[in-house]
Amino acid sequence: MSLQKLMEPEAGTNRTAVAEFILLGLVQTEEMQPVVFVLLLFAYLVTTGGNLSILAAVLVEPKLHAPMYFFLGNLSVLDVGCITVTVPAMLGRLLSHKSTISYDACLSQLFFFHLLAGMDCFLLTAMAYDRLLAICQPLTYSTRMSQTVQRMLVAASLACAFTNALTHTVAMSTLNFCGPNEVNHFYCDLPQLFQLSCSSTQLNELLLFAVGFIMAGTPLVLIITAYSHVAAAVLRIRSVEGRKKAFSTCGSHLTVVCLFFGRGIFNYMRLGSEEASDKDKGVGVFNTVINPMLNPLIYSLRNPDVQGALWQIFLGRRSLT
């Protein structure tokens, strides 16, 4: 059965089910659309290029064949996926001057966006666990963070994220949309679609809060707990150089964690706000464009190993070690 069938209005009503949505986009003036197109295209090329460069460095550079960089490579794949789910479709709409998206395509975009964002939550938690073992239990680090454990953590992240995305998508498909169909955003997401539903969204919003607490709250608590132990261990290091190295490996990850969870809480924990849509556009740009574009810079800026590997890739040389 088509997902669209699930949202048809009840028999006996004169309302017509919405077959497509109109995404209003970032700007509605035609004069600004070419500017937005150029900026988004530039951001997409920079983001995909930067993250794929990080992935290539992790794959080909022996110095980066470590658990921390294994997770970083997976994070780069997620960043490419996140921006690819939203930006190319928007670029296509800007070129064709067609702002509509079918109902099924909207739900598909919703599913894949939450799949990738959910994986981010748990992958960042796995990276915090990796730093905890590396700094607090260095003698048993190699056995506790074996390749099998690494793959299991990534697989568990995927399974949890898939369950979360499927839950929200199925719950959304049970809502009725009878018009209006204008989404004040540039991609399909839960808060904006809730505003358009002609049936009650109380259960959906309750589900979003409950699952959001599990998907974001639990990883955030685990990350804070891990880094409290890491901070205590680092402060016990007598060598200034040792402290500096430990903080540098954790600083990049903490920056990404703050950016990721901060915008997630702002976006999904304030449903019901009448002025939410315009603010959500800015948050959406940060989620799908700026954050994935910044991550390669954040992780390579203070990491000489990553910088060296990137230079070797760009210059066409391989490390001999």
UniProtKB/Swiss-Prot annotation:
Keywords: Cell membrane, Disulfide bond, G-protein coupled receptor, Glycoprotein, Membrane, Olfaction, Receptor, Sensory transduction, Transducer, Transmembrane, Transmembrane helix. PROSITE patterns: G_PROTEIN_RECEP_F1_2. Residues 1-35, 89-109, 168-205, 271-281 are extracellular. Disulfide bonds join C106-C198. The keyword Cell membrane applies. InterPro entries: GPCR_Rhodpsn, GPCR_Rhodpsn_7TM, Olfact_rcpt. Residues 59-66, 130-149, 230-246, 302-321 are cytoplasmic. Coiled coil: none annotated. It is found in: Cell membrane. GO terms for biological process: sensory perception of chemical stimulus; signal transduction. Glycans are attached at N14. This is Olfactory receptor 3A2. It comes from Homo sapiens (Human).
